[in-house]
C-alpha cells in the first residue's frame, strides 16, 4: 500500500467541475454551453467531460460544483421524468424538471455541493432557462454559472440583446465560454453546445483550437 505521505494530493481532493456553464433563450428554443475541464485540487483529472446532461428528450441541465453530486442529481431527475412521462403519456414541462432539481438540491443541501442550470423546450412555454440554487427557482432570459462566470459577467451584460436569433445565441455562448476558459484556471478543454427547439436537441463539440480568441490571448 502506498505511504500516505507519498500519495499525490489529487487522490484525496474532491473532484469538481470547476467550470463555466451558460444557457440562453431565443425565440423558439434555448442554447446551453459548457467547458469540459474537471479538476481535483490543482490537478486536471479530465479534459473532455461533457457537463451538459440530458434530463429528457428536450430538456438538459448544465452541471457545476462537485462532479459526483451534480451527476447524481441529474440522474435522479432523469429517472423521475422518464417515469412521469410514461405515466401521463406526454413529455414533461421544463419547469417541472427545474422544480425537481430545486427540490433535490434543497432537501440535500447539507450533503450535496452542486449548481445546475436547467433549460429546454416544451409545447406550453417554448424555450425556457431556469436557475436552481439553494431552494431558489427563477426563470431568466440567460444564466451563467461556475467558477468562470465571475470573469464574464461584464461581457454577457454588454453583449446580450433581447430577441437574439438562434445563430446569434450560439455565437454568444461560444464567445462567453472562450473568454472564460482563457481567464479561469478551472475552466478549459473543449466547448460543448446543445441547441434545443421544437424539433429536438442538437449537440456540438468545438475543439479548443477552433474557439475564437481575444486580443490578449
Curated annotation (Swiss-Prot):
It catalyses: Cleavage of peptide bonds with very broad specificity. Autocleaved. The resulting N-terminal Thr residue of the mature subunit is responsible for the nucleophile proteolytic activity. It is found in: Cytoplasm; Nucleus. It comes from the Eukaryota. InterPro entries: Ntn_hydrolases_N, Pept_T1A_subB, Proteasome_bsu_CS, Proteasome_sua/b, Proteasome_suB-type. The record marks 18-19 as: Cleavage. Keywords: Cytoplasm, Hydrolase, Immunity, Nucleus, Protease, Proteasome, Threonine protease, Zymogen. One of its GO terms (molecular function) is threonine-type endopeptidase activity. GO terms for cellular component: cytoplasm; nucleus; proteasome core complex, beta-subunit complex. Residues 1-18 form a propeptide. The 26S proteasome consists of a 20S proteasome core and two 19S regulatory subunits. The 20S proteasome core is composed of 28 subunits that are arranged in four stacked rings, resulting in a barrel-shaped structure. The two end rings are each formed by seven alpha subunits, and the two central rings are each formed by seven beta subunits. The catalytic chamber with the active sites is on the inside of the barrel. Component of the immunoproteasome, where it displaces the equivalent housekeeping subunit PSMB6. The proteasome is a multicatalytic proteinase complex which is characterized by its ability to cleave peptides with Arg, Phe, Tyr, Leu, and Glu adjacent to the leaving group at neutral or slightly basic pH. The proteasome has an ATP-dependent proteolytic activity. This subunit is involved in antigen processing to generate class I binding peptides. Belongs to the peptidase T1B family. This is Proteasome subunit beta type-9. It comes from Oncorhynchus mykiss.
Amino acid at each position: 500500500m502506498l505511504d500516505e505521505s507519498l500519495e499525490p494530493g489529487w487522490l484525496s481532493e474532491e473532484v469538481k467541475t470547476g467550470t463555466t456553464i451558460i444557457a440562453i433563450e431565443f425565440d423558439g428554443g434555448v442554447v446551453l454551453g459548457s467547458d469540459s475541464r474537471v479538476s481535483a485540487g490543482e490537478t486536471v483529472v479530465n479534459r473532455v467531460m461533457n457537463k451538459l446532461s440530458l434530463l429528457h428528450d428536450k430538456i438538459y441541465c448544465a452541471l457545476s460544483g462537485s462532479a459526483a453530486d451534480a451527476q447524481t442529481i441529474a440522474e435522479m431527475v432523469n429517472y423521475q421524468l422518464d417515469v412521469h412521462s410514461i405515466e401521463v403519456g406526454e413529455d414533461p414541462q421544463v419547469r417541472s424538471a427545474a422544480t425537481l432539481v430545486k427540490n433535490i438540491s434543497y432537501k440535500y443541501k447539507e450533503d450535496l455541493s452542486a449548481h445546475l442550470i436547467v433549460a429546454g423546450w416544451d409545447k406550453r412555454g417554448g424555450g425556457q432557462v431556469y436557475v436552481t440554487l439553494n431552494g431558489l427557482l427563477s426563470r431568466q432570459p440567460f444564466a451563467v454559472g461556475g467558477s468562470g462566470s465571475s470573469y464574464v459577467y461584464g461581457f454577457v451584460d454588454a453583449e446580450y440583446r433581447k430577441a437574439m436569433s438562434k445563430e446569434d445565441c450560439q455565437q454568444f455562448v461560444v464567445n462567453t465560454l472562450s473568454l472564460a476558459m482563457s481567464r479561469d484556471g478551472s475552466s478549459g478543454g473543449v466547448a460543448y453546445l446543445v441547441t434545443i427547439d421544437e424539433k429536438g436537441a442538437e449537440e456540438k463539440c468545438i475543439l479548443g483550437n477552433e474557439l475564437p480568441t481575444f486580443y490578449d490571448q
